[in-house]
Amino acid sequence: MNLDVSDLIKKVELSKEVHLKLEDDKRFFNGEEEILYLEAPTLDGVVSISEDILTLNGKLSAEIELSCSRCLQKFKYHVDTEVHESFTNNPQCEDDEIMLLEDEVIDVTEVIENNIIIELPIKRLCKENCKGLCQQCGANLNFSKCKCEKDIDPRLAKLKDFFSTQ
């Protein structure tokens, strides 16, 4: 989805309110996994211009589906974050934080995806006390107990007897 900012670049306007809902895309790939939008992401904010720098400030809200790091179960995750992005159409700008505009439009899809990726938790858990999967049979320990016997290191078997007698 593209946002036309030609009026701002031509200084016809100095700021513009933005209310966008990303309806086109249902999913995106973040380099590790495919992320599914359960609800279309919304971006509400203001685009303003100062000299040759466009600034987008707003609030991003999205409902996405993630996979739990322990049990691989899909779960719903809500993203609410502030968006602060800067753009320019000046190719001589050397600031790494400022993105270069093409054809006087802002690629809002890229802005939304990048901000969602930044907000993703490092350890994605369906619930705080997720028990994960059994390492032997693969059963989801959140829903059932497996019947696997625990392997005991023979070198430490004597310690088990030692602590049970005291």
Task: Locate each region found by the language model.
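Structured interface patches
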Residues: 1-166
